[in-house]
């Protein structure tokens, strides 16, 4: 009994090996993803000027304003387009190469475009930038799905939430670094290609070959000695039989389900509540946070000081709150973190009023700053969302990356819809406020708690919610067809 108690105590420890491997993997993938989200914002004027100069050198004519705007929109939209394409590749990549192998293969889509973008000005080719944005979007689409999956499967259940937040932490750091590098005091007219090319560095560190594969994936590949060795390396001790047994039981449930595709996931009654629980991921993208990051310089333009410093300050607040979340995610319930959306709806109303009055009331822009910071804090509190989809699906349901496709489709939708709702002007944030309120209510009523539970315990709860017949000794999901893979 005493030995069992010691084993349980050990399972709650964060070993140095586990910490280093999760930190480096999250840095190499999530950091470069976020860096590419923000890196084009500050040098956009210099880049469009380069587009115009290049076209003039070729034809002797300048690009008209509308075609130039359209060309820049294509450049920006290539990133989420590539992200959606990358999310479609996740299933084949992780099933063929494993979690670690998929991250190693994914480096191609970051290092190659980094070189192309770094050489674009010398080559006098803006087409290289457009193509590179598509390729680096593919890299982001793969990494934003595989990294949370990889981190969630490496971590013991009592640390899964905290380690899962690491990817979100490096996303906020990537945004902050891109904002700092974009400050006018640092950025130089000839330095923006270097700014774009820096994305290749973190990708090279994403997942060194000597990193272990996910023990849960190794169970699928029928490599018992490899998975035991990998788990012992992560935990720092030899006694891992208890956790291996838990992994084996999950594997039995996954084998009963078979490998499933996204279409099959949507059609299966046995996964109805899991799919419903992923809806807040879509609402997170539709809640207007991208508008805050992309257009805050417009909102703060009445201020006399340089608004780029306020932009960097919001990025710093985002990082700080995400760091705080790492330490509280295992102490607080997941739902409490997900409900970080709750203050955003009234914040949208106050921000709308502040923006409407900032030209007539001198101190209103500072109210806008406070609202923007509150908005950023609310979104920073919600990174537990990223670990949610790893927790609620079995092995067979993770590779299709339902979460990833929802994320990138929502991201792309925001990019298309936001210009259309700008007719509402300042009142567009009322629309975002409705989205935030809807997310809060939906999360409270629908999404179940997963804190401190093993994958099997979480699946058991969903089985009861889905009203699926269960065999207690084998955890077979009778509602699943024997083979639903395409």
From Swiss-Prot:
Glycosylation sites: 52
Pfam family, one: Sugar_tr
Cytoplasmic side: 1-19, 93-99, 151-162, 212-274, 328-334, 386-402, 448-486
GO CC terms of this entry: apical plasma membrane; plasma membrane; sarcolemma
Keywords, ordered alphabetically: Acetylation, Cell membrane, Glycoprotein, Membrane, Sugar transport, Transmembrane, Transmembrane helix, Transport
Reactions that this protein is recorded to catalyse: D-fructose(out) = D-fructose(in)
Annotated residues for binding of D-fructose: 33, 168, 284, 292-294, 379, 407-408
Protein origin, superkingdom: Eukaryota
Any one biological process term the GO annotation gives: dehydroascorbic acid transport
Gene3D superfamilies: MFS general substrate transporter like domains (1.20.1250.20)
Keyword Glycoprotein: yes
Protein localization: Apical cell membrane; Cell membrane; Cell membrane, Sarcolemma
Membrane topology: Multi-pass membrane protein
GO MF annotations in UniProt: D-glucose transmembrane transporter activity; fructose binding; fructose transmembrane transporter activity
Chief location bin: membrane
Annotated protein name in UniProt: Solute carrier family 2, facilitated glucose transporter member 5
Gene that produces this protein: SLC2A5
